[in-house]
Regions:
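Active-site phosphate-binding strand-loop segment of PLP-dependent enzymes
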Residues: 37-109
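Short beta-strand->loop structural element characteristic of the AMP-binding/adenylate-forming
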Residues: 29-38
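A short helix->loop->beta-strand "cap" motif at the edges of active sites that frequently abuts
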Residues: 7, 28, 86-90, 123
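Conserved core segment of the aminotransferase class I/II
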Residues: 120-211
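Substrate-binding/gating loop at the entrance of the active-site cleft, primarily
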Residues: 11-28
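Phosphate-binding glycine-rich loop
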Residues: 1-8
Length: 212
């Protein structure tokens, strides 16, 4: 919807199959490839061959992913970031298993090593953080999205025309899309999730160690 002609989502599999089911419900198209066969530098040629067609609106992947538990390396994330900027594609990172590559001691707030993310290499990103695995808080069905500031504030005429709003990406996403298609959750759940995030940020709890 941001850019006319960009009508497909590209999945780097394996990922969360429900995401494809959601696209099926709304009639959206997608392409997919298995990341196992395109690790490292090989990912560049594969992505370029798909993105160069000009019809991909977003790339989505889980990192780490389930069930293969493949963890993308910095080289691969840099490739994704570079090409998403080149072809104006939004990177959607599903971080349900945030910091859970236990080979590296992630989880210490504001201290290296920092969790890997394509957000280091592009401004076109949305990070999705579900509480289900991070805090084992699955029953309440709450999550958070983090939109890159440049993308959030970017104006798209197609969004303005479609939703009769400002056409600012972040405003359209929140007020004209998410508000309409999500059921929301109770205030108590929102406060609980916010408090768990704060305690983690303050270093009072170590959710990575708790989930190990």
């Amino acid at each position: 919807q941001r850019i006319p002609g960009k009508k497909k989502v590209l999945f780097s599999d394996p990922g969360f199959p429900i995401q494809k089911s959601q696209l099926r419900i709304i009639g959206a198209e997608w392409e997919e490839f298995d990341i196992f066969s395109y690790r490292g530098a090989a990912l560049s040629d594969k992505l370029e061959s798909i993105l160069a067609k000009g019809d991909i609106a977003a790339i989505i992947y889980s990192n780490p992913n389930n069930p293969a538990w493949i963890c993308l390396e910095e080289e691969e994330l840099a490739i994704i970031g570079r090409l998403s900027t080149k072809y104006d594609v939004v990177v959607i990172e599903d971080l349900a298993y945030f910091c859970m590559d236990f080979r590296t001691p992630f989880g210490k707030p504001f201290e290296p090593p920092y969790p890997p993310t394509a957000a280091r290499y592009t401004n076109n990103y949305i990070l999705m953080l579900s509480s289900s695995k991070i805090f084992s808080y699955a029953g309440q069905r709450i999550a958070m999205i983090c939109v890159g500031e440049e993308l959030f504030n970017r104006h798209f005429p197609a969004l303005e025309q479609r939703y009769n709003d400002s056409g600012i990406f972040g405003q359209s996403l929140v007020a004209s899309i998410l508000y309409m298609i999500t059921s929301g959750c109770t205030v108590s759940t929102q406060y609980a999730y916010a408090q768990m995030l704060k305690l983690s940020s303050d270093g009072a709890i170590d959710f990575v160690e708790d989930t190990r």
